[in-house]
UniProtKB/Swiss-Prot annotation:
Stated role: Ca(2+)-regulated actin-binding protein. Binds actin microfilaments (MFs). Involved in actin filament bundling, severing and capping. Caps the barbed end of actin filaments and is able to sever them in a calcium-dependent manner.
Provenance organism: Oryza sativa subsp. indica (Rice)
Composition-biased stretches (Polar residues): 765-777
One GO term (biological process): actin filament severing
UniProt signal peptide: none
UniProt record similarity statement: Belongs to the villin/gelsolin family.
Main location as per UniProt: cytoplasm
Keywords from the UniProt entry: Actin capping, Actin-binding, Calcium, Cytoplasm, Cytoskeleton, Repeat
Region (Disordered): 744-783, 846-902
Name of the featured protein: Villin-4
InterPro entries, alphabetized: ADF-H/Gelsolin-like_dom_sf (IPR029006), Gelsolin-like_dom (IPR007123), Gelsolin-like_dom_sf (IPR036180), Villin/Gelsolin (IPR007122), Villin_headpiece (IPR003128), Villin_headpiece_dom_sf (IPR036886)
Length: 946
């Protein structure tokens, strides 16, 4: 049987071509689209098909297909949903993962689409129930049980005391108040997630207008809200403890079974060890793991055989009374990680190249041979862009070389000169969006010794602890450095050999030649980078096979200096060579060599001519990020993937790993135990070792340790980020309870979203005014080697020291004190004119002298005076408390016994009177507003207002 998109049900035509969610309900055995406004609303008597399309970074689409079966749906409707899902998968390209979802036993992946929960309603299409925007029925008191740390399974239970227990979270929804009952054995994370359901119920069924109360199991009648809660159940009575039979009910050992679907029947396959070789490409198999069942469909199977295998899986579950089990269907070559993990050893999956014109590799060819329409299966492949560092490049850098148990601070002129046999520690402080940020890292040369590496880790950890874990920490290996490292150093040279005593001892013991770089000796450098703020000179073996047509090189021996330009290089590459010559051989002239026109002397220095590469050294591209919660128990690391993650998934009590293949981030919550916090780097290394996503991760992959409240932008870019959430104190449950009760979401001016990629620095600035720590002149000027440092000193006096140049554009900030008149243009142009005059004086063809002074124009001086007077006037304006809600300080604190009602808990200070505000903060409101947001939050925290 063959189909194409035009042969499938009209409701499926054109679907799966853009990122997002599409839902259909089965009505009279036909799929009917569900409007977007009703996504997440399910009826117990119906069956649904859900398609999640995800746009991947490699330019392709990933499709996940789910068919959801309500507990009261008919068997015919359930079968229709299963068959239609197989047909839709074939029409989409035959590589989607298909999930059978049963009410109450949904996969976490499905629940992640409909956050915070799915709350199925009684009835269905056969009963006349339709998807409507608002349920207009009278409110009925309902009791729900909530389970889950990362996503929440919600189930309605009878409104009786016997439904309650000590292990779970319960939500009692009454007409005027919502109660959350926290079982004494439930964990903080479950309680926090259940509060998201409380917020959903409040917004959906109460229009956001009702009280919320939290009841702790065991507090009895001492608490007013607890007394009110138990009164609804007819009074308090102790809850029974879970029996031992209930505790052990789910501990039955399941035996994994493999069955082959052959000519309409299932045949058991016996095995001692589950191996990949048991699966044949022209057959379908059922892998029964108890709680879930997998259907594996070989690429050589027909659509009819795949349908038959799907029906056989459904029938097997019915016959064995296992209707609640999940069924996951995978196609050969597109298996899930969980399916692969069931086997003793799974071979690397070949990288199927996908084409928007011809379909998806071999799978598309197979489908075309069966008459399937595979056009338009891919979006246009994106152009490769230089990765953005998302870090301010103008901060303060310090570098130490590790030598045994100690470290030596390098001078500013030597801190960018690293040796491959040594280990280094660097500390970089820079201005972040809300406060000063810090990155502490280690860099291990390829030939560094274990003794120095161990010492570097220990010394860096002490620095990290001394910073009270408020910095980010990095572990980097030579050859695997992230973009942030290069833009921090800007102009970097990596030399052969090493200077540490550990390295010297190592080569002495092993009888190895010491190839440590000598300025007057023979050396060859490969030049690479993307610009003046990101350029490196890497010393390589001084032989012709080290050359590459895609790069430029510097070769020197004594007073002889050559530059070699490959045929595939650009003008930028040539510019980088000139810049690196200023560092490596600043006082010697160089002789240029073009590829194919080299002199004999050049080849003689390299030991003769031989073949070399012309392909640029490949770099791994960042993959789509995956977030995992981590538990380290007795040196055993257990992880769980969080699907479609958001910032709210980062719980203060837990450690998470964000894996984007090129980098690994370990996020540590504020409430994590101190001992576990110190093992964050170990967790990252164990994650790389286990390679949970089977990505063939290198052990040298960069690892960043990120602490809650001090997240750098190169981490937050993976989220829709709200800094105020990470700056709140208390457990994840306490924070969410404050938000739910206060009715406000904490935020700063605006949440920080993923920063759009721009090349270079702020695009809105004139390039002639840009500068970096490593640049003593404008990149647009003609370069003259050996220029006197006097020019730099004088020119810098005219540049604005407060101007920041970011590797990515800074967030827009409103002016606190806008001027009504005047312009900044005269001030800027006058300073730039002076700098240009100095430039021409030093670089022009005629001899000039430096002016003794440069006067500021009257227009600029007037503008400065206007700005100063405007600020002064704003700060001295009297403050008016009229038309404002005012509460005394004692009722506004986070620890108040009588908290003020209906306030924005993220802006408690605005409810203080002007007099009390000045008394507590020691300044006026206007002065307070003029402070950076991070400083405001610190002052508020000190006063228990945050």
């Amino acid at each position: 049987m063959s189909i194409s998109m035009k042969d499938v049900d009209p409701a499926f035509r054109g679907v799966g071509q853009k990122d997002g969610l599409e839902v259909w309900r089965i009505e009279n055995f036909k799929p009917v689209p569900v409007p977007t406004s009703s996504h997440g609303k399910f009826y117990m008597g119906d069956s649904y098909i859900i398609l999640k399309t995800t746009a991947l970074k490699n330019g392709s689409f990933r499709h996940d297909l789910h068919y959801w079966l309500g507990k009261d749906t008919s068997q015919d409707e359930a079968g229709t949903a299963a068959i239609l899902t197989v047909e839709l998968d074939a029409a989409l390209g035959g590589r989607a993962v298909q999930y059978r979802e049963v009410q109450g036993g949904e996969t976490e992946k499905l629940l992640s689409y409909f956050r915070p929960c799915i709350m199925p309603q009684p009835g269905g299409v056969a009963s006349g129930f339709n998807h409507v925007e608002v349920n207009q029925q009278d409110h009925v008191t309902r009791l729900y049980v909530c389970q889950g740390k990362h996503v929440v399974h919600v189930k309605e239970v009878p409104f009786v005391r016997s439904s309650l227990n000590h292990e779970d979270i319960f939500i009692l929804d009454t007409a005027n108040k919502i109660f959350q009952f926290n079982g004494s054995n439930s964990c903080i994370q479950e309680r926090a997630k259940a509060l998201e359901v409380v917020q959903y119920i409040k917004d959906t069924f109460h229009e956001g207008k009702c009280e919320v109360a939290a009841v702790e199991d065991g507090k009895l009648m001492a608490d007013t809200e607890a007394g009110e809660f138990w009164g609804l159940f007819g009074g308090f009575a102790p809850l029974p403890k879970k029996t031992s039979s209930e505790d052990n009910g789910d501990d039955k050992e399941t035996v994994t079974k493999l069955l082959c679907f052959n000519q309409g029947t299932l045949e058991h396959i016996s095995f001692e060890s589950l191996e990949h070789e048991l699966l044949e490409t022209n057959k379908c198999y059922l892998l029964d793991c108890g709680a879930e069942m997998y259907v594996w469909m070989g690429r050589g199977t027909s659509l009819q055989v795949r349908k038959g295998a799907s029906e056989a899986a459904e029938k097997l579950l019915i016959d064995e009374n296992r209707k609640g089990s999940n069924v996951i269907k995978v196609i050969e070559g597109f298996e899930t990680i969980m399916f692969k993990s069931k086997f003793n050893k799974w071979p690397p999956t070949p990288d199927l190249k996908l084409s928007s014109e011809d379909g998806r590799g071999k799978v598309a060819a197979l489908l075309r041979s069966q008459g399937l329409d595979v056009k338009g299966l891919m979006k246009a492949a994106p152009e490769e862009e230089e990765p953005q560092p998302y870090i301010d490049c103008t901060g303060h850098l310090q570098v130490w070389r590790v030598n045994g148990d100690g470290k030596t601070l390098l001078s500013s002129s030597d801190q960018s000169k690293l040796y491959t046999g040594d280990c280094y520690i660097f500390q970089y402080t820079y201005t972040g969006d809300d406060k000063e940020e810090c990155l502490i890292g280690t860099w291990f040369g390829k030939k560094s010794v274990e003794e120095d590496r161990t010492s570097a880790i220990s010394l860096a950890s002490k620095m990290f602890q001394a910073a009270k874990f408020q910095a980010a920490q990095a572990r980097l290996y030579e050859g695997k450095e992230p973009i942030q490292f290069f833009v921090i150093f800007q102009s970097l040279q990596v030399f052969k050999g090493g200077l540490s005593s550990g390295y010297k001892n190592f080569i002495a013991v092993n009888g190895t030649d010491d190839d440590t770089y000598v300025e007057g000796g023979l050396a060859l450098f490969r030049i690479q980078g993307s610009g003046s703020e990101n350029m490196q000179a890497i010393q390589v073996d001084a032989v012709s096979s080290s050359l590459n047509s895609s790069y430029c090189y510097i070769l020197h021996n004594g007073n002889t200096v050559f530059t070699w330009t490959g045929n595939l290089t650009t003008s930028l590459d040539n510019d980088l060579v000139e810049r690196q010559l200023d560092v490596i051989k600043p006082d010697l002239p160089s002789r240029s060599q073009k590829e194919g026109r080299e002199t004999d002397q050049f080849w003689e220095l390299l030991g003769g001519k031989c073949k070399y590469s012309n392909k640029k050294i490949g770099k791994e591209n960042e993959s789509d990020p995956h977030l995992f919660s981590c538990i380290l128990s007795k040196e055993n690391l257990k992880v769980k993937e969080i699907h479609h993650f958001t910032q709210d998934d980062l719980m203060a009590e837990d450690i998470f790993v964000l894996d984007c293949r090129t980098d690994l981030f370990v996020w540590v919550g504020q409430e994590v135990d101190a001992k576990l916090r110190s093992q964050a780097m170990d967790i990252g290394e164990k994650f790389l070792l286990h390679d949970f996503l089977m990505e063939n991760l290198s052990q040298d992959t960069p690892i960043f340790i990120v602490t809650e409240g001090s997240e750098p932008q190169f981490f937050t870019r993976f989220f829709t980020w709200d800094s105020a959430k990470s700056l709140m104190h208390g457990s994840s449950y306490q924070r969410k309870l404050a938000i739910v009760k206060g009715g406000a979401t904490p935020s700063l001016d605006k949440p920080k979203r993923r920063t759009p990629a721009f090349s270079g620095r702020n695009a809105g600035q004139d390039k002639s005014q840009q500068r970096t720590r490593s640049m003593s002149h404008s990149p647009e000027r003609h370069r003259i080697r050996g220029r006197s440092p006097a020019f730099t000193a004088i020119a810098s006096a005219f540049e604005n020291p407060s101007t920041r140049y970011l590797s990515t554009p800074p967030p827009a900030v409103k002016k606190l004190f806008p001027r009504s008149g005047g312009s900044e243009l005269p001030k800027t142009s006058s300073k730039q004119s002076a700098i240009n005059a100095l430039t021409s004086a030093f670089e022009g063809p005629t001899k000039s002298t430096i002016p003794k002074s440069v006067k500021v124009s009257p227009e600029a001086e007037k503008a400065i005076q206007e700005e100063g007077s405007t600020i002064g006037e704003s700060e001295n304006e009297p403050e008016d408390d009229e038309n404002s809600t005012i509460y005394p300080y004692e009722r506004l604190t986070t620890t108040s016994d009588d908290p003020a009602p209906d306030i924005d808990v993220t802006k408690r200070e605005v409810y203080l009177s002007s007099v009390e505000f000045a008394e507590k903060f020691g300044m006026t409101r206007a002065s307070f507003k003029n402070l950076p947001k991070w400083k405001q939050n610190r002052l508020k925290s000190d006063l228990q207002l945050f």
